[in-house]
């Protein structure tokens, strides 16, 4: 079966939308198709007007002449409109502050995705200028809940780190019974639920159609960003800085969080300086958006409620877990991140 160019164009547009989410809009989609051998359309003076009205844009219509220049075989046209840095930062900030407001209104219990969501907000609060008052108020609620279930730390971030280490060890199957000996049975049960909820969320994304192609596109975008930043005179981010900022954190795993926080501070300082060129703002927008997309693939958008974990449903025991399947989205995304260095 032959696929028309208009369908190819639509497919490319949908892929772009899947990659950038609401960050793109597609217009001026057009294509052409070879005339069908059967049921040819015959144009007559009596029916030209009717056909133009009822078959406009139809794949078999020949009564309306092409308005665009003839395209080469396989060529498609799609206009992708990328949001400005200010618009992107505003939308991401609004998303995070709405999420924090939900946390502030609640005394718990919180799902693992809500707890991970708070970690993500803290990771980007400086660059996105998230309301610090809301960050602090939500942090108090999160810390109080963690203390209630038996997870403690000098700060809310430290307590969350302690929680995620336990969840990570369970998820990866590296935990030893003696290591969890001081945890109550209630906490052990809750940690298992957190682990299953995370796997359920990630399985949801690993089964998404086109996931591997999407990640391949992200790798390409990463490489292009390296070239664009290197071409700036002078540049303020090295290839190592960019790759460090795009390091996707697997919360609970051994990692150096200071790596991307340092780069976040560098970007923030640059944007706060006077007369930032438009081309630099555009590159920073691409960088921020790419990291957000990578995080969304692993943990879902901040504040979303349409996943298995959000509904309290864990992974089915008959279903291969996200962490155990080498071809899953997790293995692919971390493999691509490793290959970036």
From Swiss-Prot:
InterPro entries membership: Bd37_core (IPR021669), Bd37_core_sf (IPR038272)
Lipidation sites (GPI-anchor amidated serine): 311
Post-translational modification: The signal sequence is cleaved. Glycosylated.
Biased composition (Low complexity): 49-59
Glycosylation sites: 23, 30
One Pfam family, short name: Antigen_Bd37
Cellular compartment(s): Cell membrane; Secreted; Vesicle
Effect of residue 86 to A: No significant effects on erythrocyte binding
UniProt keyword list: Cell membrane, Disulfide bond, Glycoprotein, GPI-anchor, Lipoprotein, Membrane, Merozoite, Palmitate, Secreted, Signal
Disordered as annotated region, ranges: 36-75
Location (main, coarse): membrane
Composition-biased stretches (Polar residues): 60-75
GO molecular function: host cell surface binding
Gene Ontology cellular component list: extracellular region; plasma membrane; side of membrane; vesicle
Membrane topology: Lipid-anchor; GPI-anchor
UniProt propeptide residues: 312-341
Other comments on record: Vaccinations with the recombinant proteins derived from Rouen 1987/Rouen87 or Weybridge 8843/W8843 strains protect gerbils against heterologous challenges with Rouen87, W8843, Y5, 6303E and 1705A isolates. Monoclonal antibodies MAbF4.2F8 raised against the protein derived from Rouen 1987/Rouen87 isolate protect against virulent challenges with Rouen87 and Weybridge 8843/W8843 isolates but not 6303E isolate.
The protein's name: Adhesion protein Bd37
Organism: Babesia divergens
């Amino acid at each position: 079966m032959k696929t028309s160019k208009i369908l190819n164009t639509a497919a490319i547009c949908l892929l772009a939308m899947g990659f950038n989410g609401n960050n793109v809009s597609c217009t001026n989609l057009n294509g052409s198709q070879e005339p069908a051998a059967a049921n040819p359309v015959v144009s007559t003076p009596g029916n030209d007007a009717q056909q133009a009205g009822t078959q406009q844009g139809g794949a078999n219509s020949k009564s309306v002449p092409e308005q665009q220049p003839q395209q080469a075989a396989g060529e498609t046209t799609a206009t992708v409109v990328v949001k400005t840095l200010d618009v992107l930062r505003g939308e991401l900030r609004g998303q995070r502050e709405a999420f924090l407001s939900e946390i502030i209104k609640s005394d718990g219990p919180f799902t693992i995705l809500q707890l991970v969501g708070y970690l993500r907000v803290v990771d980007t609060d400086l660059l996105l200028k998230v309301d610090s008052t809301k960050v602090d108020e939500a942090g108090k609620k999160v810390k109080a809940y963690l203390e209630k279930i038996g997870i403690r730390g000098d700060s809310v971030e430290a307590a969350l780190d302690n929680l995620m280490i336990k969840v990570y060890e369970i998820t990866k199957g590296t935990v030893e019974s003696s290591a969890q000996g001081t945890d109550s049975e209630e906490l052990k049960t809750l940690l298992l639920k957190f682990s299953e909820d995370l796997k359920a969320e990630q399985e949801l994304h690993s089964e998404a159609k086109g996931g591997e192609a999407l990640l391949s596109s992200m790798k390409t975008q990463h490489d292009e960003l390296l070239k664009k930043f290197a071409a700036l005179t002078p540049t303020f981010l090295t290839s190592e800085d960019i790759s460090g900022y795009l390091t996707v954190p697997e919360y609970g795993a051994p990692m150096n969080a200071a790596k991307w926080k340092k780069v976040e501070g560098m970007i923030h300082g640059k944007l706060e300086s006077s007369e930032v060129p438009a081309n630099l703002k555009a590159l920073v927008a691409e960088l921020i958006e790419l990291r957000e997309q990578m995080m969304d693939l692993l943990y879902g958008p901040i504040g979303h409620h349409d996943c298995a974990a959000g509904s309290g449903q864990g992974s089915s025991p008959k279903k291969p877990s996200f962490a155990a399947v080498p071809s899953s989205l997790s293995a692919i995304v971390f493999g691509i991140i490793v290959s970036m260095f």
